[in-house]
């Protein structure tokens, strides 16, 4: 199921959402250590947001976040709410959940940086956007523990994001059609954040 969803089969999302609910209702979501796996939790939050199940997503975070590993719980909850508020176009609230956020691992740091960048784009905070781009780029290059595929995705995201910012500020004459072609060439997976920006 995860493989098919990650390949971008949009029609499969409803089926995946139903499966997730079945797993929750049957109480078979915990791993062998009796905790809610971080990656699984993130998948549940994202499918809820993608399908615009806002109430369901908020209830899910409140009910199940206490079963996340203690060392990443706070960061994961903040990111989850930040993503949810971003999807609701409540950008200031989304940023509030990232205030003082450090990110104890590369997944959390990357998520928070992408959320900040997308929020800065939506709220026309271009100075903050350029600063965050530079900070994120340095983080990627200076952390060898980040898998190569994740580094490539993050750098490609920054490439597309910079093109979007340059268009919005009038720095670049590139249009959205050219950006979409660039996304195909570098095989950038469609994400909630990038698609949200392209729709404007």
Regions found by a protein language model. Give the residues of each.
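Solenoid-like repeat scaffolds
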Residues: 21-35, 62-72, 99-108, 135-146, ...
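Generic helix N-cap/helix-start motif at coil->alpha-helix transitions
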Residues: 1-2, 32-42, 70-79, 107-113
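Residue-level signature for tetratricopeptide repeat
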Residues: 2-7, 43-50, 80-85, 119, ...
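Residues that mark the junctions of alpha-helical repeat units in TPR/alpha-solenoid scaffolds
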Residues: 12, 16, 30-37, 74, ...
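C-terminal structural cap/anchor segments
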Residues: 77, 81-150
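C-terminal non-catalytic interaction modules
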Residues: 130-200
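Alpha-solenoid helical-repeat scaffolds
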Residues: 1-35
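Helix-turn-helix repeat elements of alpha-solenoid scaffolds
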Residues: 8-22, 48-60, 86-95
């Amino acid at each position: 199921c995860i493989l098919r969803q990650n390949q971008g089969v949009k029609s499969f999302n409803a089926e995946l959402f139903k499966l997730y609910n079945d797993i929750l209702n049957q109480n078979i979501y915990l791993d062998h250590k009796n905790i809610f796996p971080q990656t699984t939790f993130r998948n549940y939050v994202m499918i809820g947001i993608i399908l615009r199940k806002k109430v369901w997503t908020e209830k899910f975070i409140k009910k199940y976040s206490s079963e996340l590993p203690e060392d990443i719980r706070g960061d994961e909850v903040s990111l989850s709410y930040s993503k949810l508020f971003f999807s609701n176009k409540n950008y200031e609230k989304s940023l509030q959940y990232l205030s003082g956020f450090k990110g104890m691992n590369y997944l959390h740091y990357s998520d928070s940086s992408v959320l900040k960048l997308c929020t800065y784009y939506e709220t026309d905070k271009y100075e903050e956007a350029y600063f965050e781009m530079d900070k994120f780029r340095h983080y990627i290059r200076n952390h060898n523990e980040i898998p190569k595929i994740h580094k490539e995705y993050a750098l490609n995201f920054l490439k597309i994001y910079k093109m979007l910012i340059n268009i919005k500020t009038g720095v670049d004459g590139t249009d959205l059609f050219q950006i979409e072609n660039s996304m195909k060439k570098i095989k950038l997976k469609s994400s909630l954040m990038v698609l949200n920006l392209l729709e404007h």
